From Swiss-Prot:
Subcellular location(s) per record: Cytoplasm
Protein name, UniProt field: tRNA (guanine-N(1)-)-methyltransferase
Role summary: Specifically methylates guanosine-37 in various tRNAs.
Assembly, per entry: Homodimer.
Record carries keyword S-adenosyl-L-methionine: yes
Top EC category: transferase
Source domain of life: Bacteria
Keywords for this protein: Cytoplasm, Methyltransferase, S-adenosyl-L-methionine, Transferase, tRNA processing
Pfam family, one: tRNA_m1G_MT
Length: 240
């Protein structure tokens, strides 16, 4: 997958040179480029923003450098142009899965009070990280790109690495434990030490269902319980 990020602060994306994403870039599974929007302004002082028409607080990013940056990147990257903004669709795991199927994507990070409305003509999709305000689109772009990239084939060692994680199948993840088996008098659940894979699988599913219902009832209501899920919960409750 190729991703181009249009931003005023390309240095912020050096985080992708590390950990799992960094290794995937080294293996050429991923290619993440940053493009400095300021390089495309025609203003002699390298300005990319100006005061809003009609008055108001703050500054607005001008259309010209944004549009010229998009046009240049589009010569090599034919992917969707995604703007990180508050009016967009709220990002979630299902959207991450959909975007992970794409071969190319372009992300546009806004700043200041937003972007000139005329730049929207070159944008295919707007995504929001949630109902809160951030200093710039970069803060939203980094977790969104990370979430998408880790679902790309070959980035993680196996699909099991993300299929059991929170949100992937509509549930929160089950509790995890590592050595030692007893810490401060608290033991790892016996089933996890049993080596019985089927019982471990059922315990994890039951825990995911119970935790989701308790912590995120909104998610649990959307989740469609199967007959197997109901049986797993019934058997689990019998053992309590």
């Amino acid at each position: 997958m190729r991703i181009d990020v249009l931003t005023l602060f390309p240095e912020m994306f050096s985080i992708f040179n590390h950990s799992i994403i960094g290794k995937a870039i080294e293996k050429e599974i991923l290619k993440i480029n940053t493009v400095n929007i300021r390089d495309y302004t025609i203003d002699k002082h390298k300005k990319v923003d100006d005061y809003p028409y009609g008055g108001g607080a703050g500054m607005v990013m001008a259309a010209q450098p944004i549009v010229d940056a998009i046009k240049t990147v589009k010569k090599e990257n034919k992917g969707k142009v995604i703007f990180l903004g508050p009016k967009g669709k709220t990002f979630n795991q299902n959207l991450a899965k959909e975007l992970a199927k794409e071969e190319e994507l372009i992300f546009l990070c806004g700043h200041y009070e937003g972007i000139d409305e005329r730049a929207y003509e070159y944008i295919d999709m707007e995504i929001s990280l949630g109902d809160f305000v951030l200093t710039g689109g970069e803060m939203a772009c980094i977790p969104i790109v990370d979430s998408i990239c880790r679902l790309v084939d070959g980035v993680l060692k196996s699909s099991e690495s993300y299929e059991d994680e929170s949100f992937y199948n509509g549930l929160l993840e089950y509790p995890q434990y590592t050595r030692p088996a007893i810490y401060e008098g608290k033991s790892v659940p016996e089933v996890l030490l049993s080596g019985h894979h089927e019982n471990i699988k059922k315990w994890r599913k039951a825990k995911s269902l119970i935790i989701t219902n308790k912590v995120r009832p909104d998610l649990f209501k959307k989740y469609k319980l199967t007959e197997e899920d109901k049986k797993i919960l019934k058997d689990f409750n019998k053992k309590l």
